Amino acid sequence: MLILFETPGGFAIFKVLNEGKLSNVEDLGNEFSTAKLARKMVKLVAFDKFDNTAEALEAVAKLLEGTPSKGLRKFLKANCVGETLAVADSKLGNIIKEKLKIVCVHNNAVMELLRGIRSQLTELISGLGDQDLGPMSLGLSHSLARYKLKFSSDKVDTMIIQAIGLLDDLDKELNTYAMRVREWFGWHFPELAKIVQDNILYAKAVKLMGNRINAAKLDFSEILADEIEAELKEAAVISMGTEVSDLDLLHIRELCDQVLSLAEYRAQLYDYLKSRMNTIAPNLTALVGELVGARLISHGGSLLNLAKQPGSTVQILGAEKALFRALKTKHATPKYGLIFHASVVGQAAPKNKGKISRSLAAKSVLAIRCDALGDSQDNTMGVENRLKLEARLRTLEGKDLGRLSGSAKGKPKIEVYDKDKKKGSGGLITPAKTYNTAADSLLQTPTVDSENGVKEKKDKKKKKKADDEEEAKTEEPSKKKSNKKKTEAEPETAEEPAKKEKKKKRKHEEEETEMPAKKKEKSEKKKKKKTEV
């Protein structure tokens, strides 16, 4: 029986010298305790060395998929025809058996043999030492990891970080230069700033026109619309601006050239950023767009660092200052950061922006991880998630105000609110009311409805009379009782005014007795004063 063994340097085939010991699997490990015992157990038959790292990577990658490489098939055909081959992978053994017609074996005894060969590998294969095996294993493992992650120079996200930074700087520079052109040329032609709103079109118009006197002779059709051109020419005739020299106009035109060149380079840079984003992060680009995706990568440091972040962090990425201020003051934390500028969040109503940004952040994290570590190079995942988000946005926008969370557990019966509804059916007990056209006629013609109405009124009057008579009967005994109470209370009320009159007389008599005493005291005081004088 032969054994196929894979090493970082190549494929080796060993022959089992003593197959009788394979029956005792537990003691097989003792047969490889020393190099001498190992040489008695197995013997190297053939060795196929890899020429370079690329060949080794290709062979190992095929083995991981469970298929033999082209070199391995040739090697097995040359050395294993008519023999039984022990392999470490049962899937690989099945494919070798189908394609090469070689009987393959995979069991516990084979695994013990492979473990023993690995422990004495440098002794069994001459010319392969530990100093060679270590670097081979390290290089092959790095290459294999790079192959699994599909790492390539196209995936370098440094270009995106630099490009988005330069794009932001260009926007600031363009805005500064354009405002300088408006302020400078505004002294000569101030009305032009209101007529032409776009900065690039303004710079083109100033460069073409120069002095406002030339506006009537020039053709602005390539730059401006017909209506704006006519308005510009009318305003140039009656402008309130001051006159400027040719030297001033020369410098203004040079500044306009700078604005136009910067705008042209910005457009080229944006196209470059677009292509790089579609190459490096296609799923993220499909979800949030090129600019927002590039800013997220730039803020995260790299695409791989961003893939390690959770959805809650990606949601508020760019709003760190507001987050820490809210935590410090114990207020509500922000709901979104850079992700707020995505088109999906912009389409949502203000009350739904928080929900959509949370959903978008969760989907964006999945897209980032797929872009950074996935095998696919297309944007199918991003497009699917964007459609899901748009569907969720439509459901949020169309949801009833009364049912914001979940659905009602129990629905009320219609009979509670509508008494005319039949139980168990949708019909009405009473017939539907129809409009009475006879009520509109001026002639007083008696109708069935009117006669019924008169009868109902008479019945109501009779009922009222009967009710009044009953009330009168009940009120008569109560009146008698009240009259008796009044007669009993009358003598008491008659005695009360007599008592009051007696009290008044006593007070009057007391006041009369006190008055002469007071007069005497006053006269005595006057006499004393006269004597003192």
UniProtKB/Swiss-Prot annotation:
Any one cellular-component term (Gene Ontology): small-subunit processome
The Nop domain sits at 280-398
Q: Which family does it belong to?
A: Belongs to the NOP5/NOP56 family.
The yes or no answer to whether the keyword Nucleus is present is: yes
Q: Which domain of life is it from?
A: Eukaryota
| UniProt feature, compositional bias: Basic and acidic residues | 412-423, 474-489, 515-524
Please give the biological process terms from Gene Ontology that the record holds: ribosome biogenesis
Q: Where is the signal peptide?
A: none
Its keywords, alphabetically, are: Nucleus, Ribosome biogenesis
Region described as Disordered:
402-533
Question: Is the keyword Metal-binding assigned to this protein?
Answer: no
Q: Write down what this protein is called.
A: Probable nucleolar protein 5-1
Q: Name one GO molecular function term.
A: snoRNA binding
Major localisation: nucleus
The residue ranges flagged as biased composition, category Polar residues, are: 433-450
